[in-house]
């Protein structure tokens, strides 16, 4: 972790870098790491920032929620199903989901799909 101190579980950034994530294993096999910005000594952000890692051959659980969401696909490619419509997504793509849109990603390759996800309440 790139920090100068950790006090009561709060990381203090030395050089603007956030602490390394602890990824949570999801039932689908995908991994989710959430940057908990409000717990850091930085301005409280009006959004949540996360890193999603989908290993090869894994399909995420279908998701839909009140929050709006943007995905920035960093690496890999796969098949996105958005409200029942399938399309290929790949590194460099930016995706936006309005509230309650059903979305699911299948990694049909061998390399992980890495996604930066940002979500916020409407």
Curated annotation (Swiss-Prot):
Effect of residue 103 to A: Failure to catalyze hydrazine bond formation. Loss of zinc-binding ability
Required cofactor(s): Zn(2+)
Region of interest called Cupin 2 conserved barrel, as start-end residue ranges on this chain: 55-119
GO MF: metal ion binding
UniProt biotechnology annotation: May facilitate future development of novel N-N forming biocatalysts.
Record note on what altering residue 28 to A does: No impact on hydrazine bond formation
Keyword rRNA-binding annotated: no
Activity: how regulated: Inhibited by 1,10-phenanthroline (OP).
Catalytic reaction annotation: N(6)-hydroxy-L-lysine + L-glutamate + ATP = 1-L-glutamo-2-N(6-)L-lysinohydrazine + AMP + diphosphate + 2 H(+)
Keyword vocabulary terms for this entry: Metal-binding, Plasmid, Zinc
Phenotype upon changing residue 26 to A: No impact on hydrazine bond formation
InterPro entries: Cupin_2, GPI/OXD, RmlC-like_jellyroll, RmlC_Cupin_sf
Pfam families linked to this entry: Cupin_2
Highest taxon of the lineage: Bacteria
List of residues binding Zn(2+): 63, 65, 69, 103
UniProt KW Zinc keyword: yes
Protein purpose: Catalyzes hydrazine (N-N) bond formation from an unstable ester intermediate, the product of the ATP-dependent condensation of L-N(6)-OH-lysine and L-glutamine substrates by a methionyl-tRNA synthase-like protein.
Name the UniProt record assigns to this protein: Cupin 2 conserved barrel domain-containing protein
